[in-house]
């Protein structure tokens, strides 16, 4: 009887493990291959070789690009090199990327930038919020952009017990923001178990100097976050659930769910066209390939444009897609005046004219 019970328990455990493995592979779109969609007027941006994980463009056409992310389980082409913030002026005929100098007093050696967001104050001061992972921790660094000498002045480092595994931020004030925690754990082994078991413990946090609170929860992995042009709605990409959530923002900064748009790909960062309200997102057609270091089968790239997301049937257009021969692991796409920038987690960046 004891042997029968033991065999039954082993069988149940094996069945559960197999079911979790299948669900894990489905969340990563492990079998999907991408059909190419080409854009004719594109070139790789010189100088960006180790990632362009997030991009934010000011209304005047200046684009900030975070580069050099080292993230648990993912490839890095320069694991010992500190991260950087690049600047591009999209008003130029052939825009180039240049590294922004960071003021003294900031630990550049441990700089590991992830998601970014800009905020323009009433006096036209430009603030840059940068998710940072020094020594595999999570902070949000607040900088002031000095356009006259293309530099960043570090103002402060923001830490909090609710900011545990920050992926992206969207600024809503000169020192306040919404942030996504893409996992409950930050330790790589526990993070992997969280993903494998399909735990929905990821969340969104509102931060200000006066108040810090959880405002949304129940995500597999809350990733990119952004705000509508009218400031009424917050958009959140759940990368492992293949969808984008629309949340209504209230006067007390709480969020309530409005709708969810389901996709067939892993949407990473979200960018919003301030003129049209369209959402642009860099996506991973097959997330499993991100974790493999296979030069013969690299992670592919995909860019989606979402129009009228509040409508009953939004329009979703695949603007760009390719198998990784040009760009590996697209994480962001954003537009300005007919120009498209496409960034990646750890690879190159692409400039296109639409």
From Swiss-Prot:
The keyword Membrane applies. Its EC number is 3.1.1.2, 3.1.8.1. GO terms for molecular function: aryldialkylphosphatase activity; arylesterase activity; metal ion binding. Glycosylated. Disulfide bonds join 42-352. Its cofactor is Ca(2+). Glycans are attached at residues 29, 254, 269, 323. Keywords: Calcium, Disulfide bond, Glycoprotein, Hydrolase, Membrane, Metal-binding, Signal. The active site is at residue 114. This is Serum paraoxonase/arylesterase 2. The lineage of its organism: Eukaryota, Metazoa, Chordata, Craniata, Vertebrata. The gene is PON2.
């Amino acid at each position: 009887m004891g042997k029968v019970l033991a065999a039954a328990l082993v069988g149940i455990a094996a069945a559960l493990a197999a079911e979790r493995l299948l669900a894990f592979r489905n969340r990563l779109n492990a079998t999907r291959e991408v059909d190419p969609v080409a854009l004719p007027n594109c070139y790789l941006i010189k100088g960006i070789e180790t990632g362009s994980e997030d991009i934010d463009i000011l209304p005047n056409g200046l684009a900030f690009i975070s580069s050099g992310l080292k993230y648990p389980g993912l490839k890095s082409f320069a694991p010992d090199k500190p991260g950087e913030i690049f600047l591009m002026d999209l008003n130029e005929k052939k825009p180039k990327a240049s590294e922004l100098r960071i003021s003294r007093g900031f630990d550049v050696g441990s700089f590991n930038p992830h998601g970014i967001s800009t905020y323009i104050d009433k006096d036209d001061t430009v603030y840059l919020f940068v998710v940072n992972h020094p020594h595999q921790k999570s902070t949000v660094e607040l900088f002031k952009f000095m356009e006259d000498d293309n530099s960043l002045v570090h103002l402060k480092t923001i830490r909090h017990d609710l900011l545990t595994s920050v992926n992206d931020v969207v600024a809503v004030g000169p020192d306040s923001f919404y942030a996504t925690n893409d996992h409950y754990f930050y330790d790589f082994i526990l993070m992997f178990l969280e993903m494998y078991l399909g735990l929905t413990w990821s969340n969104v946090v509102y931060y200000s100097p006066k108040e810090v609170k959880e405002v949304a929860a129940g995500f597999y992995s809350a990733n990119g976050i952004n705000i509508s042009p009218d400031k009424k709605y917050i958009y959140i990409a759940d990368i492992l659930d293949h969808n984008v959530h629309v949340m209504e923002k209230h006067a007390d900064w709480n969020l309530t769910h409005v709708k969810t748009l389901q996709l067939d790909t892993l949407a990473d960062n979200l960018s919003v066209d301030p003129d049209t309200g369209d959402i642009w997102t860099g996506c991973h057609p097959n997330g499993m390939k991100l974790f493999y270091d296979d030069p013969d089968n690299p992670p592919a790239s995909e860019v989606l444009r979402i129009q009228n997301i509040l409508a009953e049937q939004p329009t979703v257009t695949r603007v760009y897609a390719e198998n990784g021969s040009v760009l590996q692991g697209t994480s962001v796409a954003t537009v300005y005046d007919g120009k498209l920038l496409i960034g990646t987690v750890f690879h190159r960046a692409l400039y296109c004219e639409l």
